[in-house]
Regions:
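Active-site-proximal loop/turn and secondary-structure-junction residues that shape catalytic pockets
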Residues: 34-36, 90-94, 136-140, 168-172, ...
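Aromatic-lined carbohydrate-binding surfaces of glycoside hydrolases
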Residues: 4, 28-47, 90-96
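Aromatic-rich peripheral "rim/lid" segments of glycoside hydrolase catalytic domains that contact
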Residues: 12, 74-77, 81, 87-112, ...
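Distinct, well-ordered alpha-helical segments
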Residues: 98-101, 118, 141-157, 176-184
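Aromatic- and acidic-residue-enriched carbohydrate-binding clefts of CAZyme catalytic domains
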Residues: 41-57, 96-105
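Short, small-residue-biased leader/transition segments that mark boundaries at the very start
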Residues: 1-7
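An active-site-proximal structural segment forming one wall of the substrate-binding cleft
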Residues: 17-24, 49-88, 112-121, 150-156, ...
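Hydrophobic faces of well-ordered beta-strands that scaffold small-molecule active sites
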Residues: 28-32, 84-88, 132-134, 162-166, ...
């Protein structure tokens, strides 16, 4: 069936990535189990056929559990210890602070109960030291931030979620580092010093081609990391990871997404370290 073919293809992709990580002593964040985007439309329909109606909530729950079980079991049995965290649910909240009702997951369930189910199944099948995150973008904007806080708090209080994944797709003007700091402090209130906070998809969009102009990007990176280091060292906020959304500017998703060449990362398309790289190192000292 279409479903079993997809599982097989996914295993092939997973195997390549997990082997690369394992061979090189690298750890992976798993991204992402439940998302409105890039989940095939047929996954939500009867007989996996888009011409048929959406399945019932009970059938959807069974499919979700089967899928999460398969993915986590495959990773853990074949490459134990490589995946240290999962973004269990990605982008469940709208910018205005409401839940994303346009998601097929929401449509089938009729409510946001799919979020709790996803975390319940992830907790059930994940090894005990694997951390589970709710991940989202514009996570520093007040209305959205406050809803993410509430969703994560409810999950965390049930023992289902370990932390907040802050995607951290920034531009040169937005957000301010102060706004990011306020969001981190807000999320920390869920369980001060214990709840994990990670920046999961960090990049800073800009179109500055020259090394001289790139210095302003480096300055923003340095301000950000100074704040993160201070939050962790001096305020004892449990910031446990920063993941950049790509290695070099040449591989960044942003150029395609923005329709203009972006230079958002720590290394240039030529793999040379940029001033932003040294700025991050300086902040870590």
């Amino acid at each position: 069936s279409a479903a079993s073919d997809v599982y097989k293809r996914q295993e092939e992709i997973l195997q390549k990535v997990l082997k690369l990580a394992s061979d090189n002593g690298l750890k992976l964040r798993g991204h992402t189990l439940v998302w409105h985007s890039q989940t095939p439309e047929w996954f939500f329909h009867k007989d996996y056929n888009v011409d048929k109606s959406l399945v019932s909530k009970d059938v959807m729950r069974q499919r979700m559990e089967s899928y999460i079980k398969k993915v986590l079991t495959y990773c853990q049995e074949n490459y134990p210890g490589v995946v240290y965290a999962w973004d269990v649910v990605n982008e469940a909240v709208n910018d205005d602070g409401t839940m994303r009702t346009s998601s097929n997951w929401y449509k089938v369930y009729g409510d946001a109960g799919y979020v709790t189910d996803a975390f319940t199944f992830a907790r059930k099948y994940a090894d005990k030291d694997v951390k589970l995150f709710l991940n989202d973008y514009n996570e520093y904007a007040a209305a959205k931030r406050d809803r993410i806080y509430q969703v994560v708090k409810d999950l965390y209080d049930k023992g289902l979620c370990d932390g907040v994944g802050m995607q951290s797709h920034y531009s040169m003007t937005s957000p301010t580092i102060a706004a990011v700091k306020v969001a981190i402090q807000k999320y920390n209130q869920i369980d001060p010093g214990k709840i994990e906070i990670q920046l999961t998809e960090l990049d800073i969009h800009n179109t500055f081609r020259t090394a001289a102009d790139q210095k302003s990007v480096a300055t923003k990176y340095q301000s950000l990391f100074n704040m993160l280091v201070d939050s962790r060292r001096n305020q004892k906020i449990n910031i446990t990871g920063v993941t950049f959304w790509g290695l070099t500017d040449g591989d960044s998703w942003l150029s395609d997404f923005k329709g203009e060449t972006s230079y958002p990362l720590l290394f240039g398309a030529d793999y040379a370290a940029k001033s932003a790289y040294f700025a991050v190192l300086n902040a870590a000292k």
